[in-house]
């Protein structure tokens, strides 16, 4: 079993670029089309580690889906981000949905 560092609904930062994101899904290993030779995913060690579907915001505040290796992410210690409140809301909404009981009728 592969353990992941980050969880769904958790806020993270890109370790190189510093942008804030929210984890929306996790793959136990790289699962997209075979990478090009110049892509980060071409590294076999990175491909066999967890990969994360992360929502970030572009310069216009629009959501952008990214796919990042665990090695590219760091923990985010701050809970509130006044400059990007929609990412705070997304993270809170996902965490709430994961904690809410599922009702079956």
UniProtKB/Swiss-Prot annotation:
One biological process term in Gene Ontology: response to heat
Region (Disordered): 80-105
InterPro entries per record: Hemimethylated_DNA-bd_dom, Hemimethylated_DNA-bd_sf, HspQ
Subcellular location(s) of the protein: Cytoplasm
Signal peptide from the UniProt entry: none
GO molecular function: DNA binding
Any one annotated GO CC term: cytoplasm
Family matches, as SMART domains: YccV-like (SM00992)
SUPFAM superfamilies from the UniProt entry: YccV-like (SSF141255)
Keyword terms, alphabetized: Cytoplasm, Stress response
Domain of life where this protein originates: Bacteria
HAMAP family according to UniProt: HspQ (MF_01194)
Protein's job: Involved in the degradation of certain denaturated proteins, including DnaA, during heat shock stress.
Similarity field: Belongs to the HspQ family.
Protein name: Heat shock protein HspQ
Species this chain originates from: Yersinia pestis
Origin organism lineage: Bacteria, Pseudomonadati, Pseudomonadota, Gammaproteobacteria, Enterobacterales
